[in-house]
Design a protein with these regions (language model features):
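Accessory carbohydrate-binding/adhesion or oligomerization-edge regions at the termini
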Residues: 1-92, 177, 523, 530, ...
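Accessory beta-strand-rich segments of carbohydrate-active enzymes
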Residues: 2-19, 32-38, 54, 68, ...
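An acidic-aromatic loop/edge-strand motif
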Residues: 16, 79, 84-87, 92-103, ...
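Substrate-binding clefts and catalytic carboxylate motifs of secreted carbohydrate-active enzymes
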Residues: 23-28, 32-43, 72-73, 78-80, ...
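Active-site-adjacent substrate/metal-binding segments within catalytic domains
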Residues: 75-119, 123-133, 137-143, 150, ...
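Beta-strand-rich binding/interaction modules
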Residues: 142-144, 225-254, 261, 281, ...
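Beta-strand/loop-rich accessory regions of lumenal/periplasmic or secreted enzymes
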Residues: 180, 272, 654-662, 674-676, ...
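Substrate-binding/catalytic cleft of secreted carbohydrate-active enzymes
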Residues: 340-343, 350-576
Length: 1000
């Protein structure tokens, strides 16, 4: 358990994961299994074995496992048996065991696996027989036919063992003892669930006489031509070798290793993430044929530019963990393919394999579908940060061999993939000589691909400058030529060196819960400063594990839900895709902001800007439509020329008839002209919109409050009042309106680990801001979640005027809400003035009014922004139109309930009952031209706040409508920058103007 080395025994040298016709036997399926509470043979493992069972007896062929359970391979044992085999545990930074490397706790769950496999007679003539494990967490010991074969380490790294001479024709026994904790656990602290077991495939391989041990076909591109450089590991009896690339007419025979030479290809289509052209190739020897797919591309750094095939790359990437709510990290190809197809549909062009090599088939898919890949080594020691990096293995000579072994296995397995454009040494492992040694090894082995590692702040051993969660001011200073501001952890000289390199954000716009906000600020910097090459969102998908309450209610579990003593809560729920595969509103925002084709719509035409790396717009058409008050009046397809990558054109519009009096919008969509491997024909890449005509006048009904008749009989239009308080709207019993300043805090509202911008300037602290409490903490301190009202005045002489003061116990700051009700024909008009008193010293989450409706209200139709939610710093995906949604689709079911569902700038809202229109609410602009937004939900903000999971929300007894004059922005402060000052909601007076009419 305490061995810091990479493993021992009959370990074979790492090599490529190849598609070959050599014989192989999969060992996936049911294995005999038992779970022990500790590791036999260790001081803490005394007594864990049955009486009279020897420590290593499990490996004996005569051992009786008939009473054991069955365990599927691949799988994690803690995800099987409904807790019978232990439970998952989640931590982000902290270790779930004492930090005393290389020691681990006595309580070390250990799984024993046994199965038999029948080996064909003809394998007796194989040159070698190999047992291959693609992934086992964390340390494991292997026996075959009673013979100890070796020890493996490196949970997400392939390991092969030579079992030649041990395996025999007929039935063979394979035994694996897997320990959850080992010294390796200290270097695998990767912000994910700790999930032990054999979770990737196991194979028995027959290596044929005259076979190909390894091959690396380096295929580069320049000036329209390609070049293939072959590196082949094979014995003399494997020759002659024949390389065939049918698509290029190549058939080359090498009679010996000495004859292997580069092949020049005079004309070839290059590979890129946008045009992933692959050429099928085979390399055949006397005993084996290996199949590969070649992608011709050249990666280089020229000054501070990162180039592929001579063109600057902008990474619109995501960090991708391997996670599934039922299988954990066990691979499923159909799910993985859909995962990557969804990425393409949402304009993701790059993947960082956080924080380990993925299943090798994922990289085949990345080659095929087209992604720039940062392939990361299986390495993270983040837990040492909590002890000031004392004892960090990254600078400990005792760990050097293990570090080098990990990077060798990473590079060697995946070196043939054209999608990989950067090797990453790992993540959040501090810095030290072992990391520098890893980098030196990579540079020697693969001089073309650059080396990445974010923790190398000073740039001593890496080729690109990388940061995570740098603020907008910091990022701007990194991109600015001649800036003298010191960079994080750098001297002036080191800062200058880092500014001479390409810069990328290996993690940014943290996507936890509702957010992230202000993605466009980063994208604007990438447009302005060529040194900035984009980044990778943290992260792609929530890691929720499917669980059920004792009553059988399904939910997605996060840290602490399995009784962990040490955990990091719902920090594992920080993806742009929810655990069930639902894209979040933040992902739609991202898609629009990073769109590879940008549309700027004007009254006289459309500017089509092709921001792609190399692909033209030949695969697109540009569909336009004109909508008056949200209803289509004309549509067509632009007569647009093909736009080359990096170019822009202005396309004139056909003559458009715009009638006065309504609100008329022109919308243009860039859509796929034909189906692809990842989307159907008509899929929308990006959208542009322009206001052609605004309403000519302020609605006449807004003047009704000036000449309201007396309130007689308790009625004004569709409103009915009781004792000076609203009781019914269009026959619907209601409660309200009341002032609402509270929203259920988002994960970003709760964030305090990064500086705050409410009390400090974002440019303070070298552009990183200054420490501050979370926004949610300040809101609670201000009592915004517990406001109570006191009616100050009720006047029914002209309509109904009602003034209420809202404030919290033990606090003097308040909010005055004046309601002025009047009648307009058969409709009711409401003007609400919201005026803060003195004494407020914080931003507000929202400023609006809440009206509780009957639970029979089940949806909404609206004219305004949509179809998804929007907030002040998350508006780019919103467009103006007419939309419809059922109640449950108006909010987002985040794993931890929080604010969601706000639709800004609503003009008209119709609430539905049993799917039919019931109450129409029109909104008018205030004196500053601002429209309110709305949220319609099943629960109050206070009820949502109190729930840790969706199933903890109380049974709904109402529909809760909040009309907001304003909302606070989202930011990404759960792990990143606070809400930018422009999008903060400071206490201020606002007016809301509404008209209510019976509908249907």
């Amino acid at each position: 358990m305490t061995d810091t080395g990479p493993g021992s025994g009959r370990r074979r040298a790492p090599r490529s994961w190849l598609h070959t016709d050599a014989p192989a036997l999969p060992l996936d399926g049911e294995w005999r299994f038992r779970l022990l509470p500790a590791a036999p043979g260790t001081p803490g493992g005394a007594g864990v074995l049955p009486e009279c069972e020897g420590v290593d007896a499990v490996g004996d062929e005569s051992f009786d496992d008939s009473g054991w359970d069955l365990m599927p391979v691949p799988s994690h044992w803690v995800l099987q048996g409904d807790g019978h085999y232990g439970l998952p545990a989640y931590t982000n930074v902290q270790f779930p065991f004492p930090t005393e490397p290389p020691f681990v706790p006595d309580a070390n769950p250990t799984g024993d696996y046994r199965r038999t496999v029948v080996v064909p007679e003809e394998w007796d003539s194989a040159e070698a027989v190999v047992l291959r494990f693609d992934g086992v967490e964390s340390r494991y010991r292997v026996w075959v036919n009673g013979v100890e074969i070796g020890i493996g380490s490196g949970s997400r790294l392939a390991q092969e063992f030579d079992v030649t001479g041990v395996v025999r024709p007929g039935e063979n026994l394979v035994v694996v003892r897997v320990h959850q904790w080992s010294a390796s656990s200290y270097v695998e602290d990767q912000d994910q669930w700790w999930l032990p077991g054999i979770f990737r495939s196991v194979h028995l391989l027959a290596r044929p006489v005259g076979g190909i041990e390894d091959v690396w076909l380096r295929s580069s591109f320049a000036g329209g031509a390609g070049r293939i450089e072959a590196e082949v590991t094979a014995a003399a009896d494997a020759f002659p070798l024949t390389l065939r690339v049918p698509g290029l007419g190549i058939e080359t025979v090498w009679a010996s290793a000495e004859e292997i030479a580069a092949i020049e290809v005079p004309e070839v289509d290059p590979w890129s993430a946008e045009a992933p052209r692959l050429y099928d190739a085979t390399l055949a020897s006397a005993g084996e044929t290996v199949s590969l797919r070649l992608g011709f591309r050249t990666v280089e750094i020229r000054g501070d530019r990162f180039l592929v095939n001579g063109e600057r790359v902008v990474f619109h990437g995501v960090n991708r963990h391997e996670t599934h709510p039922d299988r954990g990290r066990a691979f499923d190809e159909d799910s993985a393919r859909e995962d990557l197809a969804m990425m393409k549909r949402f304009n993701v062009n790059a993947i960082r394999t956080s924080h380990y090599p993925p299943h090798p088939r994922l990289l085949d898919l990345a080659d095929e579908l087209g992604f720039w890949v940062v392939l990361e080594c299986d390495l993270e020691t983040h837990g040492f940060e909590r002890v000031g990096w004392a004892g960090n293995p990254s600078d400990d000579p005792a760990w050097r061999e293990a570090y080098l072994d990990r990077i060798e296995r990473t590079v060697e397995r995946d070196k043939n993939h054209p999608s990989i454009v950067l090797w990453s040494l790992g993540n959040e492992a501090g810095t030290g000589a072992n990391l520098a040694a890893m980098s030196a090894w990579v540079h020697g082995r693969d001089p073309e691909r650059p080396v990445h590692y974010e923790g190398d702040y000073t740039g001593g051993y890496t080729d690109v400058y990388s940061r995570m969660y740098s603020s907008i001011p910091e990022t701007e200073r990194i991109g600015t030529d001649g800036s003298l501001t010191p960079l994080l952890g750098c001297s002036p000289g080191e800062s200058a060196r880092q500014r001479s390199k390409p810069f990328l954000l290996c993690e940014y716009v943290h996507a936890m819960g509702n957010g992230p906000g202000a993605i466009d600020q980063y994208e604007d910097l990438v447009d302005r400063f060529p040194r900035l090459h984009g980044g990778f969102v943290w992260e792609w998908r929530d890691h929720g594990l499917r669980a059920r309450t004792p009553e059988g209610v399904e939910y997605y579990a996060y840290g602490g839900d399995f009784g962990e003593v040490v955990h990091d809560g719902n920090f594992v729920m920080d993806g742009m895709v929810l655990s069930d595969g639902t894209p979040s509103p933040g992902l739609f925002e991202w898609k629009q902001i990073v769109a590879p084709v940008r549309l700027t719509v004007r009254g006289d035409g459309v500017v089509i800007e092709n921001r792609r790396h190399d692909a033209s717009t030949a695969d697109l058409r540009f569909a336009w439509r004109v909508e008056r008050d949200g209803r289509v009046t004309a549509e067509g397809v632009l007569d647009a020329p093909v736009v080359a990558a990096g170019d822009a054109v202005h396309v004139e519009l056909p003559p458009l008839e715009v009638r006065p009096g309504g609100e008329t919008w022109l919308t243009v969509d860039a859509v796929l002209d034909a189906p692809t491997a990842w989307a159907e024909e008509g899929h929308v890449l990006s959208t542009g919109q322009h206001l052609l005509a605004a309403p000519s006048a302020v609605p006449a009904w807004t003047r009704a409050v000036r000449s309201a008749p007396p309130l007689e009989g308790g009625a004004l239009g569709v409103a009915r009042f009781r004792d000076g308080r609203l009781a019914f709207l269009a026959g619907l019993p209601v409660d309200g309106p009341r002032a609402e300043l509270w929203r259920a805090p988002t994960d970003n509202d709760e964030g305090a680990g990064f500086p705050g911008y409410v009390t400090g300037d974002p440019y303070d602290g070298d552009g990183r801001g200054l420490p501050a409490p979370s926004s949610a903490a300040r809101w609670r301190e201000a009592g915004l979640d517990r406001l109570v009202g006191r009616v100050q005045e009720v006047d029914a002489s002209a309509g109904l005027r009602r003034v209420t003061r809202f404030s919290a116990a033990d606090l003097d700051a308040g909010l005055l809400m004046e309601e002025r009700w009047s009648v307009d024909g058969e409709s009711t008009v409401l003007r609400v003035d919201l005026v803060p008193t003195r004494g407020w010293d914080s931003v507000w989450p929202r400023l609006g009014i809440r009206i509780d409706m009957p639970a029979s209200i089940d949806g909404a139709e609206w004219f305004g922004t949509g179809p998804l939610e929007s907030y002040p710093d998350s508006l780019r995906a919103a467009r103006v139109g007419r939309f419809t949604a059922e109640m449950d689709r108006l909010t987002t079911p985040y794993a931890r309930p929080q604010e969601s569902g706000h639709r800004s700038s609503v003009r008209e809202l119709t609430l539905t009952e049993a799917g039919s229109p019931r109450l129409r609410i029109e909104a008018a602009r205030d004196l500053h031209g601002r429209l309110p937004g709305f949220t319609l939900a099943r629960h109050t903000p206070q009820e949502i706040t109190a729930a840790a999971h969706p199933h903890e929300l109380p049974e709904s007894e109402r529909a809760v409508l909040v009309i907001d004059a304003a909302q606070h922005g989202l930011g990404s402060r759960a792990c990143g920058p606070d809400v930018w000052p422009d999008f903060q909601l400071r206490p201020e007076a606002r007016t809301i103007l509404l008209r209510f009419t019976a509908a249907g």
